[in-house]
Amino acid sequence: MLICHQCLSSRLTYISNLGLNIAYRLIEQFTDDSKLVIVVTSRTLPRVREVVDLIKTYAEKCGKSGAVDFDYLLVDFTDMVSVLGAAYELEKRYDAIHYFYANAAQGVYSGIDWLGATKAVLRDPLDAVTNPTYKIQRVGVKSRDGLGLVFQANVFGPYYLIRRIIPLLAKGKAKVVWLSSLMSDVKYLSLEDVELLRTDSSYEGSKRLVDLLHLATYKELKSLGIHQYVTHPGIFTSHSFYQYLNFFTYYGMLFLFYLARWLGSPWHNIQGYKGANAPIYVATLANPTFEHQALKYGSATYRDGMEYIAKHEIDPTGMHDAYKYIRDLAEEWDIKLKDQITIGRSLS
């Protein structure tokens, strides 16, 4: 167990841009006599404060305010110096981490192809709201580090942080949970464009990389006592596209989601709370002796909204090449950040 600055026996949960519903369900599931410390991360302090206030209110509602404590960490996964700084802060503050959620979901969207969306809905409404290929994504967007922005935010940044804090995760016998997507098909990733700079499906490609990265690393982590899983939340309403919807299109989307569920789609969870089912299941309920880590665990619902866990096989095509690229890139950044490491140590 972790001894934190409050001198209480604690379990530390590191939340990487984690959706509130996952935090809520984690609080509900936590029944240990020890204290749960939730580390909220964001790029900005106002967002951290907002999230902490919401989680505190929920903990009080559940009657667990005394069992939950909070810390925060400012980190930008599209800035490698920031990622390195986050690793050092965690090393300074804590002895162990018990849960790590890698939930980055950066996209470079610029709108919706309404003509394409209309045609898709008329042609096959169920497929249109399950595989929405009419979202417009910008091509070639780089971070200030010169890397593909979506690749760095969703894949490389979180991977690099995990890699730097392996000792903390090992001490806590941690559960590392990656959030992938229902739309992480093989077709969205070209091994000639691992940084996703030449594709108009960079978000989906990044989630395909998450699947492959998990397959390539979970066995090595398991040998260190760290159990890693990959999950997806199904389909639910989120704030990411509200700016492109008006009153009519929002409720039209909601109607189609419920219609899809009624027609038999297991993936239209609709509420974010239900979408959080699989990420919580693998962290708190799954038995690592029996659960297969090579599978993807998805949040699913029956027609009546009853929740269940659905398991997927993951196509390993390209796993070794993708992992080699990411691993080699991490080693390059070790060298680039060498001076930052020296500076960080001299100031600590």
Swiss-Prot record:
Pathway field: Steroid biosynthesis; zymosterol biosynthesis; zymosterol from lanosterol: step 5/6
Catalytic activity, EC: 1.1.1.270
Keyword Repeat: no
Enzyme class: oxidoreductase
Catalytic activity: a 3beta-hydroxysteroid + NADP(+) = a 3-oxosteroid + NADPH + H(+)
Family matches, as InterPro entries: Ergosterol_Biosynth_ERG27 (IPR051593), NAD(P)-bd_dom_sf (IPR036291)
Record keywords: Lipid biosynthesis, Lipid metabolism, NADP, Oxidoreductase, Steroid biosynthesis
GO terms under cellular component: endoplasmic reticulum membrane; lipid droplet
Active site, renumbered: 180, 203, 207
Sites where the protein binds NADP(+): 18, 37, 41, 47, 163, 203, 207, 238
PANTHER family, per the entry: 3-KETO-STEROID REDUCTASE ERG27 (PTHR43647:SF1), DEHYDROGENASE (PTHR43647)
Similarity annotation: Belongs to the short-chain dehydrogenases/reductases (SDR) family. ERG27 subfamily.
Descriptive protein name: 3-keto-steroid reductase
Source organism of this protein record: Eremothecium gossypii (strain ATCC 10895 / CBS 109.51 / FGSC 9923 / NRRL Y-1056) (Yeast)
